[in-house]
Design a protein with these regions (language model features):
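Interfacial segments of transmembrane alpha-helices in multi-pass membrane proteins
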Residues: 2-4, 404-405, 409-424, 428-429, ...
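Pore- and gate-forming transmembrane helices of large, multi-pass membrane proteins
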Residues: 177, 489-509, 561, 581-617, ...
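Juxtamembrane "pre-transmembrane" interface segments
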Residues: 204, 448-452, 460-507, 780, ...
Length: 1007
């Protein structure tokens, strides 16, 4: 063996690096156990702060460098944030209102929603259609793009500036998100921009137990504004007239009547509507009080018909609060106050915004305040914004209530002093992300740049708000378009299941190798497997990649790849020994002859793994990462490390009489002369019939598509007692109703075998961008199940807590927005096509004949069709989920990777025999090549199936569908190598070769 020194050097470096990185995991566990011995939490933290691993690394360094666990193993939250590119463009255009720009934005949004695509390109095309003859510079020669775009700039220059600014906004948003998460204290977060998906950021936060806080923190743009306000008595008459005009059926067309604005009418209107109170304090103590009637009036059809606005909105007097309303009425009120009628009736400089929290001085729950803000700038923006804030702290006021104190820079302090001086006796509204957090009365000029946000806050609220303000403002709004929440208890169960399946699969593989190849070769292969796992974990830790349940599956599957390499080598050695060679020569020839098959099969699998890594997200990337590492490591350990050991032993005259078989495997598939090629008509007919059945099933039964492809929400609910999915479907059938009055699609399927775990799927208001819809959906689910007596939790918060299992709870949840679902669908199609094309080209490059490329690609397509076809035929008939989701697409690509591995081995033997017998009978040559590799095919398939069956039976529900697809892929991929790929290659290759003898004769005669 050549280059032994390089192999030894690489092995030593990998060993040292793996030991170094894995040691941090042991150090962390050691320090945790020592700290746990201390009873005082402060003492525990002081101990952790004082330790230094290896004299250099702090406890925090150890925590960040140890093996990271993914969400499915540790619990936590995974979200994909989408930065609003349309909002970035509107900011760059200074919120232009001309028809050309607004129409182009509307058209681009519609096209993006319908078909996806690059929004900047969609907008530019739409603008050229809506404003023909006009240049982009007319819109974007603004203060925002000063120095980049001038009125004379060409469209190409403007587009370049826009794209650069959009990318800057995304980069800045990424940095803001990272800063917020760091301040939140998440351990080992994974934050990355998704390549090829403009404006999307993936955030993985293991260990998060408060998803509501994270949603609020991640989606908050920190757009802080200070607004002057109207007094409520100035606005009440306008609201009354708006109420009257809506009741009379006004559709917003021009009217001749005017708004009564005299002071007497205003006072009369307020007096009529205003409850008795002092300085905005609205006390509700009696049943007949005005605010208590808010809910009753809203339910009274006659009152709503007579007063569409004021039956829902209770007018108030004093300062900026113009009224109170129940949270359930806010949507209807918004529809009125933002209507075309309202634009004609209400003052043009009026903005109406809701309070961020329910009014804390009322004795009725979920009553919100509506505030009247006054626009005083020509641009329509707030006179003072959050970019002047230099610091924000969570503190307590004189009454002991949590507040957020802020400091401003010099310019901000100057404007703040002017603003407060001009509004003494009035309120100034402090607005964050479009809602009013507080609107305090100004008692006098405030200099020094100090301000405070107060309200109905908890300590956590003020801490998060201060962190959000300190992290900086998001350049554009961000919304969660995909989300997954996994409870820590479920994660612990996944760890247990994953470890059990891994250990059992590993032990069975070791036993199988010894049974098939005897003690010494079997244990050598097993040693290579152990080293494989050690190196894989070490490399994974050095990359700071999180280990997930699919990642564990990828590691287990890579063990199958490692076994395949050893099987190829050992079968070759057995052939050489049977030909009469000595042990040294047989081992050298075995490793040499098996190299090309191992190299090609591993490289084709690697191509598939890279495509998975590039196109996949979340669990698929975790699987692809460990699988790729496992493929590379298994190639190194099987081909080079084991060869070093054999060479060392044989050079010292050890293992000279080593046996590579046992009584079980001695004559396995030896001397067989199956005539596979003569059966191709039968096998092709069977394959065509199967394909017709599968395709027919697609039209008749379809596929069970998950929310990954349809968009929606999944809630995995664990009940105290067994329940039937049909009962859940009945209970929830009418519960989820969209804003337009249509029923949302809702389904329920059983998870596991105990009957206590049900997954509820719904597309309830999935198109809405309102973050509050997430909470609404969970509340509807809780109320419906509670009313039916299926859960007994006291409140929705306990129901949403995955650690509170008694009484029933949501143990995990997933959300996929419609735009993400479309991208996932297209990504799935492209990834499978790219894999097939890449493999076709590689086989063509390596085998230099299109016959092998065609045979392998068509067979791979049939393998994929077979797996998908069985999912179509069997969903709803087997006791586990067969939904088509991202993990399933990963399984399809993995099937392609495994199947091509098998086909390459067969084709490699055919290629070898073609070189040895160029004039031989092609049919006999193909048959002989397949027969010669049958032992390897059976051993590899069996060992891989052992691994997959362990994952399928012991790996848990989340990975069962994946392993089932892989089992189908291994079985039918092996069969297609023999009965589809090889006959196809034979037919194409055979026809080409038949013409060669005549050509050769002609060439000879010409000479």
């Amino acid at each position: 063996m050549q280059n032994k020194g390089i192999v030894i050097c690489v092995a030593v470096l990998l060993t040292l690096a793996s030991i170094f990185y894995l040691s941090f995991s042991f150090a962390t566990r050691y320090y945790d156990s020592k700290a746990a011995e201390l009873k005082d939490p402060i003492a525990q933290q002081n101990y952790k702060d004082s330790v230094k691993y290896l004299g250099v690394y702090s406890y925090q360094n150890c925590l960040e460098t140890q093996i990271g666990l993914g969400l499915d193993l540790k619990g936590g939250m995974n979200v994909i944030l989408e930065i609003s590119v349309p909002d970035v463009l509107e900011n760059l255009a200074d919120h232009k209102t001309d028809a050309g720009f607004t129409n182009a934005m509307r058209e681009a949004r519609a096209q993006e929603e319908a078909n996806g695509g690059d929004f900047v390109s969609l907008f530019i095309n739409a603008y050229h259609k809506s404003a023909p003859g006009h240049k982009l510079a007319e819109v974007f020669a603004t203060q925002q793009l000063q120095g980049k775009v001038s009125p004379q700039s060409s469209d190409a220059e403007v587009e370049k500036a826009i794209r650069a600014s959009v990318q800057d906004a995304i980069d800045n948003s990424f940095n803001v998100v990272r800063t917020r998460i760091d301040k939140f204290g998440v351990v080992q977060p994974n934050i990355q921009k998704l390549e090829g998906q403009q404006g999307r950021i993936m955030v993985e936060m293991p260990g998060i137990s408060q998803p509501e806080r994270m949603r609020k923190m991640l989606q908050g743009s920190a757009n802080l504004e200070f607004w002057e306000t109207y007094n409520s008595d100035e606005i009440a008459p306008y609201l009354q007239q708006l109420d009257t005009r809506i009741a009379n059926g006004d559709n917003g067309e021009e009217k001749t009547d005017t708004v009564a604005t005299d002071s007497a009418a205003a006072k009369k209107a307020v007096a009529k509507a205003e409850p008795k109170k002092a300085e905005g304090k609205f006390s509700i103590k009696k049943k007949d009080d005005a605010a208590a009637k808010v809910g009753e009036d809203a339910q009274n059809a006659a009152a709503i018909k007579a007063h569409p606005l004021l039956a829902r909105l209770q007018l108030a007097g004093g300062l900026s609060t113009v009224g109170y309303a129940s949270v359930r009425d806010t949507a209807a009120i918004n529809k009125i106050i933002y209507s075309a009628v309202a634009k004609r009736v209400l003052p043009s400089d009026l903005r109406l915004l809701w309070s961020a929290k329910p009014a804390d001085h009322l004795n009725v729950k979920n009553i919100y305040e509506l505030h009247a803000l006054k626009v005083t700038t020509t641009t329509g923006r707030a006179p003072l914004e959050g970019d002047v804030i230099t610091d924000a702290k969570d503190e307590f006021d004189q009454m002991g209530s949590p507040v957020v104190s802020m400091k401003m820079n010099t310019e901000g302090a100057r404007k703040w002093a002017q603003m407060t001086k001009a509004n003494v006796g009035k309120a100034i509204a402090i607005v964050l992300d479009g809602v009013v957090y507080s609107a305090p009365r100004v008692n006098g000029e405030i200099d020094g740049g100090s301000s405070q946000i107060s309200g109905n806050f908890t300590i956590e609220d003020t801490k998060d708000l201060a962190n959000t303000l300190k992290s900086g403002r998001m350049p554009a709004p961000a919304r969660i378009v995909q989300e997954e929440v996994v409870g820590p208890t479920l994660g612990a169960q996944s760890i247990q299941m994953g470890i059990i399946s891994f250990v059992v699969a590993f032990v069975l593989l070791m036993v199988y190798m010894v049974v098939m190849y005897n003690i010494v070769p079997g244990m050598m292969a097993n040693l290579a497997l152990l080293v494989n796992v050690f190196f894989t974990l070490g490399i994974l830790t050095s990359f700071q990649a999180a280990l997930t349940l699919p990642g564990l599956a990828g590691m287990v599957l890579s063990l199958g790849t490692a076994v395949d390499a050893n099987v190829l080598i050992y079968e070759r050695i057995k052939e050489e020994l049977r030909s009469g060679k000595g042990m040294k020569q047989a081992v050298a020839a075995g490793y040499g002859n098996a190299f090309s098959a191992i190299f090609d099969s591993n490289l084709t699998s690697l191509i598939t793994g890279v495509i998975l890594l590039v196109t996949g997200t979340g669990p698929i990337r975790g699987f692809a990462t460990t699988w790729i590492i496992g493929i590379i490591v298994s190639f190194f350990t099987a081909v080079f490390l084991t060869r070093l050991v054999y060479d060392y032993k044989l050079n010292h005259d050890k293992w000279m009489h080593c046996k590579f078989d046992t009584a079980v495997s001695h004559n396995l598939m030896q001397g067989k002369k199956y005539k596979f090629m003569s059966m191709y008509k039968i096998t092709f007919t069977v394959a065509i019939i199967a394909a017709v059945v599968f395709i027919s099933s697609f039209f008749v039964r379809g596929l069970s598509k998950s929310i990954d492809f349809t968009g929606g929400r999944n809630y995995v609910v664990q009940f105290e007692s067994p329940v039937e999915p049909e009962e859940i479907r009945t209970v929830l059938g009418d519960a989820f109703v969209n804003a337009d009055g249509t029923k949302a699609n809702t389904s329920a399927i059983a998870i596991g075998t105990d009957g206590k775990t049900i997954r509820v799927s719904t597309n309830y208001m999935i198109e809405s961008n309102n973050p509050a819809v997430d909470d609404q959906a969970e509340t509807i689910l809780y109320n419906s199940l509670k009313k039916a007596g299926l859960v007994s939790q006291e409140n929705v918060d306990a129901f949403k807590n995955p650690d509170v299992r008694q009484g029933g709870s949501i143990i995990s949840s997933t959300k996929v927005g419609p735009s993400v679902a479309k991208d996932i669908t297209m990504g799935a199609i492209y990834s499978v096509l790219f894999a097939l094309i890449a493999i076709f080209l590689y086989i063509l490059l390596r085998f230099r004949n299109v016959a092998f490329s065609l045979g392998s690609t068509i067979a791979l397509a049939f393998d994929a069709l077979t797996v998908v076809g069985f999912y179509s035929l069997l969903w709803g008939l087997v006791p586990f989920s067969l939904e088509i989701d991202q993990t399933f697409i990963g399984a399809i690509l993995t099937v392609v990777g495994y199947s091509i591995n098998d086909k390459v081995v067969v084709f490699d033997r055919i290629r070898e025999n073609l070189k040895l017998h160029p004039k031989g009978d092609r049919q006999q040559l193909f048959n002989a090549s397949i027969n010669e590799t049958l032992a390897r095919t059976i051993n590899t398939s069996t060992s891989t199936l052992i691994v997959l069956l362990c994952i399928f039976i012991l790996g848990g529900d989340s990975i069962r569908s994946f392993s089932f697809a892989m089992i189908l892929g291994v079985v039918f991929g092996t069969l297609s190598s023999i009965f589809i790929a090889s006959p196809l290659a034979y037919l194409v290759l055979g026809r080409k070769i038949k013409a060669e003898p005549a050509e050769e004769v002609a060439a000879v005669e010409a000479k």
